[in-house]
C-alpha cells in the first residue's frame, strides 16, 4: 500500500518504498494518485543520490498535475536534482518557476528557495 511505502521512506528504507511505488505506477497507470506517487518515487531516488531518475520522476509528478498539491515540491525537487546534475541554468530557471507559479505557497519555504539559489549561484 502507499501508506506502507511512505512508512518505508520515513524509515529510510528507500528500496522497499521504490518497489511499491514502481509497482503502483505499473498496475494503476491512470490513477489520480500518480502525481503523489511519482513525487514519492522521486524522493526515493533523491535519497539514493540517483539525480537523473529523481529529476525525471519530479518532472513526471509536476507534469501530471501542474497545479496540484505536490507541484511546488516537485518543481523544487527537480531544481535540486538538476543542480546535482550540474545543469545549473536549468536548476535556477526551475527555482524561478516555483516562485512565479506558486507565489505565497506554503509547501516550499522562501528561505529554502533563497538558500538553494545561493548554493546554485543563481544570482
Predicted regions and their residues:
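Short solvent-exposed coil/turn linkers within tandem alpha-helical repeat scaffolds
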Residues: 27-33, 62-71, 100-111, 123
